[in-house]
């Protein structure tokens, strides 16, 4: 059993996207182009890997042997909104189709490897992510505030009364779905079941970053972005 557990842990996959909206440009951090007319104002420093990065990231420089910098990416999208959509989905905006974000696609493809998950597989901290597109609302991002709070998730009823209401609702929805009301009704039922699991799951403790020791909060950064990174960990 222990060997199987270790093997499962190795095979589990996840991805973290740090979306630095409004952050510094690439020529100020990753690709300084020293000596070039298009270069940035900062000096490059050597790292633990092969690349040089900005002088203002000495701690990141120590981890560059674990990193890969992609400098060949380009786009013709000049509008920020369209560019953001492109970066989150891999597709240029098209009025005829709504593409799913990377988080929705990864969740859809890898969910069978994460059977132990009681929380949604796609989480966005602070909102702002692109939605599930044509994959449907069952793969929509679960939004958590940077302090770990989730709106409307606290149980306002005693357990017995809540489960009685959920059982009655499930009966009504099954009748609704049996009338072939479409995918939206089935997705709604799935989301309700996930919500109930969330309200009772111990895995929700992962979002309570304010319970972390002060030194851990300071290490990640005791701010919205740092807390988001800590949750992702």
What residue spans do the PLM features occupy?
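Ligand-binding pockets and gating/stacking loops
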Residues: 1-233
């Amino acid at each position: 059993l222990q060997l199987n557990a270790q093997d499962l842990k190795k095979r589990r996959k996840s991805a973290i996207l740090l979306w630095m909206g409004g952050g510094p440009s690439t020529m100020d951090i990753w690709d300084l182009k020293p000596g070039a007319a298009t270069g940035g104002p900062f000096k490059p420093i050597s790292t633990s890997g092969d690349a040089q990065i900005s002088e203002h990231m000495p701690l990141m420089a120590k981890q560059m042997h674990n990193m890969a910098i992609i400098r060949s990416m380009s786009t013709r999208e000049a509008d920020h909104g369209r560019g953001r959509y492109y970066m989150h989905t891999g597709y240029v905006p098209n009025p005829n189709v709504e593409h799913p974000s990377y988080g929705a696609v990864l969740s859809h493809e890898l969910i069978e490897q994460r059977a132990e998950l009681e929380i949604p597989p796609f989480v966005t901290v602070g909102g702002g992510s692109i939605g599930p597109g044509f994959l449907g609302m069952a793969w929509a991002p679960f939004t958590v505030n940077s302090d770990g709070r989730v709106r409307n998730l606290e149980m306002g009823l005693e357990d017995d009364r809540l489960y009685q209401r959920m059982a009655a609702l499930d009966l009504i929805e099954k009748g609704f779905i049996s009338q072939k009301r479409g995918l939206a009704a089935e997705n709604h039922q799935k989301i309700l079941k996930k919500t109930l699991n969330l309200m009772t799951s111990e895995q929700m403790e992962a979002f309570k970053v304010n319970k972390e020791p002060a030194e851990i909060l300071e290490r990640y950064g005791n701010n919205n972005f740092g807390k988001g990174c800590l949750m992702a960990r």
